[in-house]
A protein has these predicted regions:
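Phosphate/nucleotide-binding beta-alpha loop and adjacent structural elements of enzyme active sites
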Residues: 1-221
Length: 221
Protein backbone atom coordinates (compact mmCIF):
# COMPACT_ATOMS: atom_id res chain seq x y z
CA UNK A 1 0.00 0.00 0.00
CA UNK A 2 1.36 3.41 -0.99
CA UNK A 3 1.08 6.49 1.23
CA UNK A 4 1.86 10.02 0.21
CA UNK A 5 3.39 12.58 2.58
CA UNK A 6 0.03 14.01 3.69
CA UNK A 7 -1.36 10.56 4.46
CA UNK A 8 1.60 9.89 6.74
CA UNK A 9 1.21 13.23 8.54
CA UNK A 10 -2.53 12.66 8.93
CA UNK A 11 -1.86 9.23 10.42
CA UNK A 12 1.02 10.13 12.75
CA UNK A 13 -0.09 13.41 14.28
CA UNK A 14 -3.33 12.23 15.93
CA UNK A 15 -1.57 9.19 17.41
CA UNK A 16 1.31 11.31 18.65
CA UNK A 17 -1.08 13.71 20.35
CA UNK A 18 -3.10 10.84 21.77
CA UNK A 19 -0.02 9.21 23.26
CA UNK A 20 1.23 12.53 24.61
CA UNK A 21 -2.07 13.21 26.37
CA UNK A 22 -2.11 9.69 27.77
CA UNK A 23 1.44 10.09 29.08
CA UNK A 24 0.85 13.50 30.64
CA UNK A 25 -2.29 12.27 32.40
CA UNK A 26 -0.18 10.51 35.01
CA UNK A 27 1.60 13.70 36.09
CA UNK A 28 -0.83 15.35 38.50
CA UNK A 29 1.44 17.23 40.90
CA UNK A 30 1.68 21.02 40.95
CA UNK A 31 4.57 22.43 38.88
CA UNK A 32 5.36 18.94 37.52
CA UNK A 33 6.91 17.98 40.84
CA UNK A 34 6.26 14.27 40.23
CA UNK A 35 8.01 14.45 36.86
CA UNK A 36 10.97 16.23 38.47
CA UNK A 37 11.07 13.72 41.33
CA UNK A 38 11.27 10.82 38.94
CA UNK A 39 14.51 12.17 37.49
CA UNK A 40 16.15 11.63 40.87
CA UNK A 41 14.40 8.47 42.06
CA UNK A 42 13.69 6.59 38.80
CA UNK A 43 12.88 3.11 40.10
CA UNK A 44 10.01 0.65 40.12
CA UNK A 45 8.20 -1.02 43.03
CA UNK A 46 9.14 1.61 45.59
CA UNK A 47 7.49 2.59 48.85
CA UNK A 48 6.18 6.10 49.57
CA UNK A 49 4.51 8.08 52.33
CA UNK A 50 2.37 11.04 51.32
CA UNK A 51 1.16 13.30 54.12
CA UNK A 52 -1.52 15.63 52.85
CA UNK A 53 -2.64 13.14 50.20
CA UNK A 54 -5.85 15.07 49.39
CA UNK A 55 -8.16 12.94 47.18
CA UNK A 56 -5.22 10.90 45.90
CA UNK A 57 -5.31 12.34 42.39
CA UNK A 58 -5.64 16.12 42.43
CA UNK A 59 -2.20 17.66 43.04
CA UNK A 60 -0.86 14.27 44.15
CA UNK A 61 2.90 13.79 44.31
CA UNK A 62 2.60 9.98 44.35
CA UNK A 63 -0.13 9.18 41.79
CA UNK A 64 2.45 8.85 39.01
CA UNK A 65 4.64 6.49 41.02
CA UNK A 66 1.69 4.22 41.79
CA UNK A 67 0.18 4.14 38.32
CA UNK A 68 3.32 4.00 36.18
CA UNK A 69 5.99 2.50 38.42
CA UNK A 70 3.94 0.16 40.63
CA UNK A 71 4.74 1.89 43.92
CA UNK A 72 2.69 1.40 47.08
CA UNK A 73 2.80 3.05 50.47
CA UNK A 74 1.00 5.03 53.16
CA UNK A 75 -1.43 7.79 52.18
CA UNK A 76 -2.35 10.18 55.00
CA UNK A 77 -5.31 12.59 54.85
CA UNK A 78 -7.13 14.00 57.93
CA UNK A 79 -10.22 15.43 56.17
CA UNK A 80 -12.99 12.75 56.16
CA UNK A 81 -14.52 13.76 52.81
CA UNK A 82 -11.15 13.78 51.05
CA UNK A 83 -10.14 10.57 52.80
CA UNK A 84 -13.19 8.76 51.36
CA UNK A 85 -12.28 9.99 47.88
CA UNK A 86 -8.66 9.01 48.47
CA UNK A 87 -9.61 5.41 49.25
CA UNK A 88 -11.82 5.24 46.16
CA UNK A 89 -9.18 6.72 43.87
CA UNK A 90 -6.08 4.78 44.84
CA UNK A 91 -4.96 1.16 44.77
CA UNK A 92 -6.31 -0.91 47.66
CA UNK A 93 -2.81 -2.25 48.33
CA UNK A 94 -1.90 1.11 49.84
CA UNK A 95 -2.26 1.81 53.56
CA UNK A 96 -4.79 4.59 54.22
CA UNK A 97 -4.64 6.68 57.39
CA UNK A 98 -7.31 9.24 58.34
CA UNK A 99 -5.16 11.10 60.89
CA UNK A 100 -3.35 14.38 61.48
CA UNK A 101 0.37 14.01 62.15
CA UNK A 102 1.59 15.77 65.30
CA UNK A 103 4.73 16.18 67.40
CA UNK A 104 5.80 13.70 70.06
CA UNK A 105 4.70 15.98 72.90
CA UNK A 106 1.12 16.38 71.68
CA UNK A 107 -0.95 14.42 74.18
CA UNK A 108 -4.54 14.60 72.94
CA UNK A 109 -5.95 11.87 70.69
CA UNK A 110 -7.76 14.52 68.63
CA UNK A 111 -7.03 17.93 67.16
CA UNK A 112 -9.30 20.70 65.84
CA UNK A 113 -8.70 21.78 62.25
CA UNK A 114 -10.23 23.97 59.57
CA UNK A 115 -10.58 22.85 55.98
CA UNK A 116 -10.62 25.15 52.95
CA UNK A 117 -10.65 23.25 49.65
CA UNK A 118 -7.09 21.90 49.26
CA UNK A 119 -5.75 23.52 52.42
CA UNK A 120 -6.10 22.12 55.92
CA UNK A 121 -4.96 24.19 58.88
CA UNK A 122 -4.60 23.35 62.53
CA UNK A 123 -6.52 25.91 64.61
CA UNK A 124 -6.78 28.11 61.50
CA UNK A 125 -8.15 31.65 61.63
CA UNK A 126 -10.39 31.26 58.58
CA UNK A 127 -14.13 30.67 58.87
CA UNK A 128 -14.29 27.54 56.75
CA UNK A 129 -15.44 24.05 57.66
CA UNK A 130 -14.28 22.75 61.04
CA UNK A 131 -13.19 19.16 61.51
CA UNK A 132 -11.93 17.08 64.39
CA UNK A 133 -9.16 14.69 63.41
CA UNK A 134 -7.43 11.81 65.14
CA UNK A 135 -3.75 12.38 65.87
CA UNK A 136 -0.58 10.34 65.61
CA UNK A 137 3.12 10.90 65.23
CA UNK A 138 4.59 9.51 62.03
CA UNK A 139 6.78 7.04 63.89
CA UNK A 140 3.75 5.75 65.83
CA UNK A 141 1.98 5.26 62.51
CA UNK A 142 4.94 3.37 61.05
CA UNK A 143 5.22 1.17 64.13
CA UNK A 144 1.48 0.44 64.09
CA UNK A 145 1.68 -0.71 60.48
CA UNK A 146 4.94 -2.58 61.14
CA UNK A 147 6.85 -0.66 58.50
CA UNK A 148 10.44 -1.73 58.91
CA UNK A 149 11.53 -1.50 55.28
CA UNK A 150 13.46 1.45 53.95
CA UNK A 151 11.10 4.18 52.76
CA UNK A 152 11.98 5.49 49.31
CA UNK A 153 10.04 8.76 49.40
CA UNK A 154 8.33 10.85 52.05
CA UNK A 155 6.36 13.81 50.71
CA UNK A 156 5.11 16.30 53.28
CA UNK A 157 2.56 19.07 52.67
CA UNK A 158 0.98 20.32 55.89
CA UNK A 159 0.60 24.06 55.34
CA UNK A 160 3.11 25.43 57.85
CA UNK A 161 3.12 22.64 60.43
CA UNK A 162 6.23 20.91 59.13
CA UNK A 163 8.10 21.31 62.41
CA UNK A 164 5.34 19.50 64.31
CA UNK A 165 5.45 16.53 61.96
CA UNK A 166 9.25 16.37 62.01
CA UNK A 167 9.15 16.40 65.80
CA UNK A 168 7.07 13.22 65.66
CA UNK A 169 9.69 11.26 63.71
CA UNK A 170 12.17 9.00 65.45
CA UNK A 171 15.04 9.52 63.02
CA UNK A 172 17.16 6.94 64.83
CA UNK A 173 14.58 4.34 63.82
CA UNK A 174 13.01 5.58 60.59
CA UNK A 175 14.62 7.19 57.57
CA UNK A 176 13.63 8.11 54.04
CA UNK A 177 15.85 7.89 50.96
CA UNK A 178 14.23 11.03 49.57
CA UNK A 179 12.33 13.66 51.53
CA UNK A 180 10.15 16.20 49.69
CA UNK A 181 8.86 18.98 51.90
CA UNK A 182 6.72 22.02 51.17
CA UNK A 183 7.75 24.85 53.48
CA UNK A 184 8.16 28.60 53.73
CA UNK A 185 10.82 28.11 56.41
CA UNK A 186 13.48 26.59 54.17
CA UNK A 187 16.61 27.56 56.09
CA UNK A 188 15.21 26.40 59.42
CA UNK A 189 14.07 23.10 57.92
CA UNK A 190 17.36 22.65 56.07
CA UNK A 191 19.35 23.13 59.27
CA UNK A 192 17.19 20.63 61.14
CA UNK A 193 17.27 17.97 58.42
CA UNK A 194 21.01 18.45 57.98
CA UNK A 195 21.42 17.48 61.63
CA UNK A 196 19.59 14.25 60.77
CA UNK A 197 21.91 13.50 57.82
CA UNK A 198 19.65 14.79 55.05
CA UNK A 199 21.37 16.71 52.27
CA UNK A 200 19.52 19.39 50.33
CA UNK A 201 19.35 18.36 46.67
CA UNK A 202 17.07 20.65 44.68
CA UNK A 203 14.33 23.25 44.85
CA UNK A 204 11.50 21.75 42.78
CA UNK A 205 9.00 24.61 42.99
CA UNK A 206 8.50 27.89 44.83
CA UNK A 207 8.16 26.19 48.22
CA UNK A 208 9.00 22.51 47.56
CA UNK A 209 12.45 21.23 48.46
CA UNK A 210 14.02 17.83 47.92
CA UNK A 211 16.42 16.27 50.43
CA UNK A 212 18.34 12.99 50.27
CA UNK A 213 19.38 10.77 53.14
CA UNK A 214 23.18 10.66 53.31
CA UNK A 215 24.29 8.74 56.41
CA UNK A 216 27.80 9.29 57.64
CA UNK A 217 30.18 6.44 56.90
CA UNK A 218 30.94 5.84 60.53
CA UNK A 219 27.30 5.91 61.60
CA UNK A 220 25.93 2.59 62.82
CA UNK A 221 22.34 1.83 61.83
Amino acid sequence: MNFNFYDIIKYLVPNFLKNLIKKKRYYNAIDNIDRKLNKYINRRNGFYIECGANDGVNQSNTWFFEKKLNWRGILIEPVPKLFTQLKNNRCKKNIFENVCLVGKNYKSKYINMRYDNCQTKVFGDNKNKKIKAKTSTLSELLDKNKIIKSIDLFTLDVEGYENNVLDGINFAKHNFKFFLIETKKFFKIKKYLSSKNYQFIKKLSRHDYLFKYTPKKYEKR
